[in-house]
Amino acid sequence: MFQDFPNGLLWLSREALSPASPELSWTDNPVNGILSVVCLLVAMCDIKDFLIIWKPLMPALARWKPLVSLEYNMQLSRTRNRLAGLLFLPFCLAADWAGLTPLPLFLLAGVLAVTGLLKWAISRILSHKRVSQDNWNAATNAAFSLFIVLSVTAVLTVGIMGAFKVVTDVVRIALLVEIGLFWLLSIVREAQIINSNCGPFRTFLYLCALELPPCAALAAAILYLG
């Protein structure tokens, strides 16, 4: 069908355009729903271990010595490692729900996993003759210990704010603040534990070696892949 216009002809189709399909929300995605249910079931099965590890972790928010004591107890340290691994996926789901990064869920999980493995590898390669092995393990595992607290806090933040229909931008800011405080606290605890065996200058060098490469790799991955 043609219609005259002063500057020419405009062709109009007789067929109506199909309406654009609405974008699938996070909760409507079946993969997210299945993973959330799986995480909930796993958390319910491991509630006893959560209660066991929570007691030694709470004092670590105020002091560094409980983190060292945690390394002396093999059963607690293994429980810590297992729970930190189990909480990794719920944390990624919470970050993905809030749109914390432009990365999709599984890519975000992969980037965070590689970042954690990079820090673990550096802690195993780096020489630490001035720092005892137990203190070194406590310092390098401080972030993984406190990650349990961060993950529970992040999941509760997303769950409660989501239930009250809080704007996603507000939830995102809340998660960023929690992650920033967690990262700062983990660095402070690492510094305190290492500084108990060596001076401030060596502590600073150790922190640079442990923290800068993983942080740089994480930032580069988000900027490049996002």
Residue ranges of each PLM-predicted region?
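Alpha-helical transmembrane segments and their helix-start/interface "positive-inside/aromatic belt" motifs
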Residues: 26-37, 79-86, 202-209
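Hydrophobic alpha-helical membrane-embedded segments
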Residues: 27-55
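Long, highly hydrophobic alpha-helical transmembrane signal-anchor segments
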Residues: 1-38, 89-103
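Cytosolic juxtamembrane amphipathic/interface segments immediately preceding
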Residues: 16-24, 65-80
